[in-house]
Amino acid sequence: MAKERCQKRSFQDTLEDIKNRMKEKRNKNLAGIGKRKSFIVAPGQVPTNTATLLRYYQDNNRLLVLALENEKSKVREAQDVILQLRKECYYLTCQLYALKEKLTSRQSEETTQNWKGRPSDVVSSIDNTTRDLSGKSLQQIAVEETDCPYQTTEPSPAVTPETQGCDFDSGKVESTDEVLPRTISIRRHLRKDFSNISHSTTLEDCKASPRVAQSLEVKGSRCREVTVTLHRLENVCLWNKDQISLCSRLINPAKITETEVILSSKPEQIESKHKRARKRRAEQRRTKQRCKSKSSLRSKGNKNKDKQGLPPTTLDGGIGSCDAYDFNLKGTVHPTPFRQKMNNGCNKETDSSNSEVSDLECSTSEDESDDLYLPPSKRLRDYRESERAVTRPRSKRGLQYPDGKERKEVLPSTAPTGIPPETQESPRCSLKDVTNILQCPRVKIRKPSLPPKRREDSPAVALTKRRCSTIKSYKEPTLASKLRRGDPFTDLCFLNSPIFKQKRGMRCPKRRTKQTQ
């Protein structure tokens, strides 16, 4: 027994046992899944016969079909209800639209009837009220003018039943006899023309008699009533103005003619005022433009004076570091700081004083003028052709000299115009004069390399100028170049590229075949 215990099982045997156990478990699980249980059967009752199982299945199917039919019937009923409700909603909306149309048609009919029936009555009532008010106001003015100046008490103005219904401060008409219809639009703003009609007579009377000034408020209120009634019913009875003017002429023709004259002259006066204002504005603009043009002309004159008075040295001095941001330089050449012109000490002093004066004048002219800002170097640049800056001469590369040296120092053939004769004639200077005197620019020219025979024979031959190596031609290309341009089989540049380099093994048989042929 001890020996058997001591004997250990191999690893493979243990693995086989584990595999067998796993297979058994899997088979059990598959057998349990394969068994089909009925839905209605209780867990305690397990059917054994196939006949009983078939019965159970049939009963379940019948129940499912009945439930399905019930659900379908319910859905149909719900759909019928939805359709009926939609029909009712559509019918109600149609009724609503029809009622709205009827309402709008009735309102339009009522408005047309009101417009047709009412205006005659309204116009007649307005005529009566305006006649009474205008007659009473004019009569009271005449009576007050004839009264004695020593009289302290004034007769109280008679209040008519028409005026009781009007509220002047609020601007609303509350007449007791007749009310305006709803459709008539009422404007609360008064026109200036009607206010002029009412107030013109009162102003004339005030100038004549001082007593009228006290009772002017009462008259103004009455006249306002007339203007309010006229203005508010302007849309209804525009044709009634002639009748009102005729009635007022019958009462007091002299004063009404005066008011009419004043009214007719009013718009002309307004137009004349507008014209005067326009003329004044135009004159002010012209004067401003003249002042600006004068200031600009003065500044230009100062500039020209500065240019004429300054010598070429100051002109060259003006062209300085400011030219870095000046892009208007076209033909001028920037002189180097080592190539300035030489002048005597007295000339320099006078030039410096002149330049200071010119700078001050330019600054004052800039303050006065409204022109665009320009850099200071721009103003000193517009000088004559004779007074240009010193340009750098070209190096004469093409010239050949008989000496055998590779390099030479050659003086320029054309000396600059502005340099005095001393600097041209004295190339050799002492150490003291080097800093003050401008030496002539010396150009180092390299001798072109030529064969020795030609160097000995030809003394000086002008070679062709050096040009740009790349030349762009805009001519129409030839047919061959057109064909080769984009075609990978005929394009030479494309075929010469390393992509199309064939291998050595591919080239050898081709050569051999050519040799054999």
From Swiss-Prot:
GO terms for cellular component: centrosome; chromosome, centromeric region; condensed chromosome, centromeric region; cytosol; kinetochore; nuclear speck; spindle pole. Ubiquitously expressed in proliferating cells. Moderately expressed in the oocytes. The modification Phosphoserine is found at residues 426, 497. Ubiquitinated and degraded during mitotic exit by APC/C-Cdh1. Residues 273-302 have a biased composition (Basic residues). A motif (PXVXL/I motif) lies at residues 441-445. Residues 1-176 are annotated as: Necessary for interaction with PPP2CA and PPP2R1A. It is found in: Nucleus; Chromosome, Centromere; Chromosome, Centromere, Kinetochore; Cytoplasm, Cytoskeleton, Spindle pole. Keywords: Cell cycle, Cell division, Centromere, Chromosome, Chromosome partition, Coiled coil, Cytoplasm, Cytoskeleton, Kinetochore, Mitosis, Nucleus, Phosphoprotein, Ubl conjugation. Residues 341-363 have a biased composition (Polar residues). Residues 379-390 have a biased composition (Basic and acidic residues). Residues 107-136, 149-173, 267-317, 334-427 are annotated as: Disordered. A motif (D-box) lies at residues 447-455. InterPro entries: Shugoshin1/2, Shugoshin_C, Shugoshin_N. GO terms for molecular function: kinase binding. Residues 1-89, 268-291 form a coiled coil. GO terms for biological process: attachment of spindle microtubules to kinetochore; cell division; centriole-centriole cohesion; chromosome segregation; meiotic chromosome segregation; mitotic sister chromatid cohesion, centromeric. Shugoshin is Japanese for guardian spirit (as it is known to be a protector of centromeric cohesin). PANTHER family: SHUGOSHIN, SHUGOSHIN 1-RELATED. Belongs to the shugoshin family. Interacts with PPP2CA (or PPP2CB), PPP2R1B, PPP2R5A, PPP2R5B, PPP2R5C, PPP2R5D, PPP2R5E, SET, LRRC59, RBM10 (or RBM5), RPL10A, RPL28, RPL7, RPL7A and RPLP1. Interaction with protein phosphatase 2A occurs most probably through direct binding to the regulatory B56 subunits: PPP2R1B, PPP2R5A, PPP2R5B, PPP2R5C, PPP2R5D, PPP2R5E. Interacts with PPP2R1A and NEK2. Interacts with CDCA8. Plays a central role in chromosome cohesion during mitosis by preventing premature dissociation of cohesin complex from centromeres after prophase, when most of cohesin complex dissociates from chromosomes arms. May act by preventing phosphorylation of the STAG2 subunit of cohesin complex at the centromere, ensuring cohesin persistence at centromere until cohesin cleavage by ESPL1/separase at anaphase. Essential for proper chromosome segregation during mitosis and this function requires interaction with PPP2R1A. This is Shugoshin 1. It comes from Mus musculus.
